[in-house]
Amino acid sequence: MDLQSLKQSVSQRLEFIGGALERFRTRDAEREELLAQQLSTMQEKVAAMEAHSEQMQAQVRRERERAMTDLLTQLPNREAWQERLAFEYNRWQRYRHPLSVSVIDIDLFKKINDSFGHKAGDRVLQLVAREMKSRLRSTDFIARFGGEEFVLLLPETGLEAARDVVEQFREHVGKLPFHFGGKPVSITFSAGVSEFRDGDTEDAVFDRADRALYQAKDAGRNQVMVD
């Protein structure tokens, strides 16, 4: 083979190899592009799933909050109270820090309903709830227990200090300016307070506070008693 023929043969071979390399690079680039598209699609799906999960979790939290809230007063309801009481009771059993409970009942509430109607009664409940909630300490927990009755949980608070807190609530509620149908309506409450003691169950301390409440009622209402 002469030199010219050899050059031509080598040139053809190089062209063939170059073409093969170009086709390989093209296919490789196409594969990379396809993989990038698939990865992008997967990332979008994961992001959509995460967003949906967050929405569902937020909805569950909202539904739970609604289930734990009294619609009229916007305070925690009895179910929320039972959950929080169980938590604080377990904490008290472990650390033995002071823990007190108060049961609060609006005085002569039936008379308010009978005299002014249920709208007035509802408004009284809302006013009392708002007033007490605004004066809660950061660790306290208040709930509407039912009807005109509220319950207050006071962690890190002994009996006398708890009575002082509830007494301040009583004084402020008694000063609430409330008129219905152009007539002034007096709002007061009676309350019982008790502190957890050795051997107490959740029901035991609640029963003592409830008993103290009725002692306050029997003694003339608009006062706080302890047991």
Regions flagged by a language model, labelled:
Residues Q8-L72, R78-R91, Y95-P98, D140-A143, ...:
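Signal-transducing coiled-coil linker helices
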Residues E65-E83, I104-H118, Q126:
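Conserved nucleotide-binding and Mg2+-coordinating catalytic segments in signaling enzymes
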Residues W81, L85-A86, S102, V124-L125, ...:
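Heptad-repeat coiled-coil signal-transmission/dimerization helices
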Residues F87-S100, I104, S115, S134-F141, ...:
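Nucleotide second-messenger and two-component phosphorelay signaling modules
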Residues F109, V128, I142-F145, F150, ...:
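Hydrophobic framework residues that shape the active-site pocket
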Residues A129, A161-P177:
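Alpha-helical scaffold within the catalytic cores of cyclic-nucleotide enzymes
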Residues R144, V173-F189:
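Catalytic core regions of nucleotide second-messenger enzymes
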Residues R163, G181, S194-V226:
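Catalytic-core segments of nucleotide cyclases and related cyclic-nucleotide turnover enzymes
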